[in-house]
Amino acid sequence: MSQIYFTQDHEWLSVEGQVVTVGITNYAQEQLGDLVFVDLPQSGTKLSKGDAAAVVESVKAASDVYAPLDGEVVEINEALANSPELVNQKAEKEGWLWKMTVQDETQLEGLLDEAAYKTLIG
């Protein structure tokens, strides 16, 4: 079973073993409005925590999505190239952005659990 974490930048992470699936939260997609474009990192890209890894563009604004951990991108959500609205429809499921390996599991300790994230967004 996967463990779910959140960041203060409104990203969610689903951790299964050494692979982490990353996306933006439902709250974030609601704030952005209808997405029209998603620019994802390439598979094989090495990311450091805090790097701008992707861009989600909506009718309102373009926003960076940051790497929540150090690691390497192992898969991207190809469906978003033609259907960025998946992020609006199912942000925390089929609207995931990329999957990456975890290099340093201690970085998970600084992330929020669901209760802490709900407190953050009020």
UniProtKB/Swiss-Prot annotation:
PROSITE patterns: BIOTINYL_LIPOYL, LIPOYL. One of its GO terms (cellular component) is glycine cleavage complex. GO terms for biological process: glycine decarboxylation via glycine cleavage system. Belongs to the GcvH family. The keyword Cell cycle does not apply. The gene is gcvH. The glycine cleavage system catalyzes the degradation of glycine. The H protein shuttles the methylamine group of glycine from the P protein to the T protein. Keywords: Lipoyl. HAMAP family: GcvH (MF_00272). Its cofactor is (R)-lipoate. Binds 1 lipoyl cofactor covalently. The lineage of its organism: Bacteria, Pseudomonadati, Pseudomonadota, Alphaproteobacteria, Hyphomicrobiales. This is Glycine cleavage system H protein. Residues 19-101 form the Lipoyl-binding domain. It holds the Pfam family GCV_H. The modification N6-lipoyllysine is found at K60. The glycine cleavage system is composed of four proteins: P, T, L and H.
